[in-house]
Amino acid sequence: MGDETIKVAILGSGNIGTDLMYKLLDHPGSMELVLLAGIDPHSEGLARARSLGVATSDQGIAAVLERPEIQIVFDATSAKAHVRHAKLLHETGRIAIDLTPAARGPYVVPPVNLTQHLDALNVNLITCGGQATIPLVYAVSRVTPVCYAEIVSTVASRSAGPGTRQNIDEFTFTTAHGLEVIGGAQQGKAIIILNPAEPPILMRNTVYAIPAGDFDPAQVRDSIEAIVAEVQQYVPGYRLTNPPVFNMRETPWGRKPVVTALLEVEGAGHFLPTYAGNLDIMTASARRVGEVFAQQLLSRREVLV
């Protein structure tokens, strides 16, 4: 594709890395995928990449570091692995878009702060639950202060690969922190449930938000519906299953009107089954964030020319 694109690589040839590969090939935008690197030479992801003409390696991060032309790296490995990767990528001046809960860089949720950290060399996409639910908490907090937000993400057990299962503890901490830092809640709590039901269920999320004071329910409802429409621009299967509910409850902060929103995420079916909306929203968010970084790198290149 030449000088009109930014060369990118994917670290991790599991479910998330492979699905992201399909998204980047189908809608490359300003990016050119030049490498999919994993550590299992027999992984399905590497085999699929080779069949599609994408360069592959089973040498992990080492293969990326050998390619100086790669400017953006999507890390779809694990939180523990990314801690090491982040240091190496930073030392070589690569932009890391972290799809693990390692959180070595600032959080990014596209409909909330897509362009806020374009000078960072490492940004974190929090978790699938964070990408799905933080926009709704933010939608409430931009109308009225939120003293507490709690989310419950239920995903199909079959959609949770080894990386997801290794990251369960980091998921709860990082998502809860994201509810506060990006969502705007004074206190956040996150719960994830792996549901073994057959046939597998779609990703389902319950969001509770307790406003600190009085508010106009119509404004909150409109704010939620507006941000859902924003997310649907890059995750078409993202939708509310019912209109937001407002009901009075006894809470640790006194008797308050609690906002409850129910949503589900259906995947696009690029590589993963449509029930794996939890993984699809991560890869869709990653592609969106990567495109913004790539456009900025290209604009800087034009200025230098």
Curated annotation (Swiss-Prot):
InterPro entries: Acetaldehyde_dehydrogenase, Acetylaldehyde_DH_C, NAD(P)-bd_dom_sf, Semialdehyde_DH_NAD-bd
GO BP terms in the entry: catabolic process
Keyword hit for Ribosomal protein: no
Reaction it catalyzes: acetaldehyde + NAD(+) + CoA = acetyl-CoA + NADH + H(+)
GO-annotated molecular function: acetaldehyde dehydrogenase (acetylating) activity; NAD binding
Residues that bind NAD(+): S13, G14, N15, I16, S159, A160, G161, P162, G163, T164, R165, Q166, N167, N278
Record's keyword terms, sorted: Aromatic hydrocarbons catabolism, NAD, Oxidoreductase
Catalytic residues as annotated in Swiss-Prot or TrEMBL: C128 (acyl-thioester intermediate)
Keyword Methyltransferase carried by entry: no
Domain of life: Bacteria
Matches recorded under Pfam families: AcetDehyd-dimer, Semialdhyde_dh
Enzyme class: oxidoreductase
EC number: 1.2.1.10
UniProt family annotation: Belongs to the acetaldehyde dehydrogenase family.
Name of the protein in its database record: Acetaldehyde dehydrogenase
Organism encoding this protein: Roseiflexus sp. (strain RS-1)
